[in-house]
UniProtKB/Swiss-Prot annotation:
GO MF, one annotated term: structural constituent of ribosome
Record's keyword terms, sorted: Chloroplast, Plastid, Ribonucleoprotein, Ribosomal protein
Main location: plastid
PANTHER family named among the record's database cross-references: RIBOSOMAL PROTEIN S15, BACTERIAL AND ORGANELLAR, SMALL RIBOSOMAL SUBUNIT PROTEIN US15M
Any one of the GO BP annotations: translation
Record GO cellular component, one term: chloroplast
Subunit record text: Part of the 30S ribosomal subunit.
Membership in a protein family: Belongs to the universal ribosomal protein uS15 family.
Pfam families according to UniProt: Ribosomal_S15 (PF00312)
Gene: rps15
Organism, scientific name: Oenothera argillicola (Appalachian evening primrose)
Intracellular or extracellular location(s): Plastid, Chloroplast
Protein name: Small ribosomal subunit protein uS15c
InterPro entries: Ribosomal_uS15 (IPR000589), Ribosomal_uS15_bac-type (IPR005290), uS15_NS1_RNA-bd_sf (IPR009068)
Length: 87
């Protein structure tokens, strides 16, 4: 498990309450939990936590795509995650 594989996209002076910062933090947690679940497949509580964090990140990305499409596309490309699919 890689514990120190963090994404340093946001500068230190960035507002910690901003949507971009929160999405980066959630992405770090998701990648850490994913690597944990590769070794511990039956850890169902961690699977539940992963699903909750994925939902939170999806809601934040949806909000950002509605408010500022340019910042949304930049963040998606920096974090190397898939774009939201609309229903």
């Amino acid at each position: 498990m890689v514990k120190n594989a963090f994404i340093s996209v946001i500068s230190q002076e960035e507002n910690r309450g901003s949507v971009e910062f929160q999405v980066v933090i959630f992405t770090n947690k998701i990648r850490r939990l994913t690597s944990h679940l590769e070794f511990h497949r039956k850890d169902f509580l961690s699977q539940r936590g992963l699903r909750k964090i994925l939902g939170k990140r999806q809601r934040l990305l949806s909000y950002l795509s509605k408010k500022d499409k340019v910042r949304y596309t930049e963040l998606i490309s920096q974090l190397d995650i898939r774009e939201l699919t609309t229903r």
